[in-house]
């Protein structure tokens, strides 16, 4: 019986959670942290704000948001992998982040009221959901008018030569890194599949607009291997 995308992705992250943070650094050559830092500068998160990190995984971006909003702010992190959340909980407790609450839930049906958050983020998670537009619409629903929806994700490089090298890396080399460092060749093969199938920057910007967001902009990183998309709710 063929697994659904949701079932397959859930199985992947339930298995690789222990090595996820290390592997992110290995396969991105530690660039993912720089991409997130640049994204946070673009967001200019305000003290005391309320933020939601969708598909929060091990809570790295959740914690960055908590640092930005400060003690008087509030941050929720949501993920469907309990094992990934367990790693995040350890980080949150050790860091003393009382303003963070991590929740087990589904990005396709966010368990929050309309117009709740000032910022709603998703980092390297949108490519793994069953339906991109449904999740973007949910993120738009729960953000306040004037609030910001932000996606940091792998993208499709457009530079000739660079594009081909990117696909070779994702298809052949990254799964080998998964096998060497995390004993998970099959799981990291899935990650390259999801990255290859993900929309390019212009296509994702169009989905942001279709979800009801305005002033949509995108910002490529490292030759377009990743990009941040930002949209505002009117």
Curated annotation (Swiss-Prot):
Top class in the EC scheme: transferase
Pathway(s) served: Quinol/quinone metabolism; menaquinone biosynthesis; menaquinol from 1,4-dihydroxy-2-naphthoate: step 2/2
Any GO BP annotation: methylation
Swiss-Prot/TrEMBL keywords: Menaquinone biosynthesis, Methyltransferase, S-adenosyl-L-methionine, Transferase
Xref: InterPro entries: MenG_heptapren, SAM-dependent_MTases_sf, UbiE/COQ5_MeTrFase, UbiE/COQ5_MeTrFase_CS
SUPFAM superfamilies to which the protein is assigned, alphabetical: S-adenosyl-L-methionine-dependent methyltransferases
Its biological purpose: Methyltransferase required for the conversion of demethylmenaquinol (DMKH2) to menaquinol (MKH2).
Name this polypeptide is given: Demethylmenaquinone methyltransferase
Organism lineage: Bacteria, Bacillati, Bacillota, Bacilli, Bacillales
């Amino acid at each position: 019986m063929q697994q659904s995308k949701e079932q397959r992705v859930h199985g992947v992250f339930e298995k690789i959670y222990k090595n996820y943070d290390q592997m992110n650094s290995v396969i991105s050559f530690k660039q993912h942290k720089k991409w997130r830092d640049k994204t946070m500068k673009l967001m200019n998160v305000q003290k005391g704000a309320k933020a939601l990190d969708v598909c929060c995984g091990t809570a790295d971006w959740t914690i960055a948001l908590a640092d930005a909003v400060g003690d008087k702010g509030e941050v929720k992190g949501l993920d469907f992998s309990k094992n990934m959340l367990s790693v995040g909980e350890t980080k949150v407790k050790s860091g003393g982040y009382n303003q963070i609450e991590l929740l087990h839930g589904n990005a396709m049906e966010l368990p929050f009221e309309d117009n709740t958050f000032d910022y709603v983020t998703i980092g390297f998670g949108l490519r793994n959901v069953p339906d991109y537009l449904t999740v973007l619409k949910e993120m738009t629903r729960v953000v306040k008018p004037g609030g910001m929806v932000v996606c940091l994700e792998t993208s499709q490089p457009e530079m000739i030569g660079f594009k081909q090298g990117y696909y070779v890396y994702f298809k052949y080399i990254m799964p080998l890194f998964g096998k060497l460092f995390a004993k998970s060749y099959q799981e990291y093969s899935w990650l390259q599949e999801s990255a290859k199938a993900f929309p390019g920057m212009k296509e994702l910007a169009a989905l942001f607009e279709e979800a009801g967001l305005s002033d949509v902009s995108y910002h490529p990183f490292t030759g377009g291997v990743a990009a941040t998309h930002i949209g505002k709710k009117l």
